[in-house]
Amino acid sequence: SCLEYGHSCWGAH
């Protein structure tokens, strides 16, 4: 998931 990276979905992707 995007949140697992410590970012928002729109921030990591």
Curated annotation (Swiss-Prot):
The lineage of its organism: Eukaryota, Metazoa, Ecdysozoa, Arthropoda, Hexapoda. This is Neuropeptide CCHamide-1. Disulfide bonds join 2-9. It comes from Delia radicum. One of its GO terms (biological process) is neuropeptide signaling pathway. Expressed in the midgut but not in the ring gland, CNS, thoracic perisympathetic organs (tPSO) and abdominal perisympathetic organs (aPSO) (at protein level). Keywords: Amidation, Disulfide bond, Neuropeptide. The modification Histidine amide is found at residue 13.
